Amino acid sequence: MKIRYQGKETETGADTVAAFLATQGVDAAEGVVELDGEIVAGDAVAATSLHEGAELNAFRIVAGG
């Protein structure tokens, strides 16, 4: 299926947000995941299904001083 990830069209066979992020080397626990304009929180990442045309973004949280 085709989705938009970080603003770019991407082809994937992953069926969940977590499975797709794993193919991209992204650990959802280290940031914030947004699917179709809504935040996907915590454990919901593993249970949330992807669909054709989904818009997915992942933001890494960086802190320091």
Model-derived features: where do they sit?
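Ubiquitin-like/PB1-type beta-grasp interaction modules and other compact soluble beta-rich domains
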Residues: 1-64
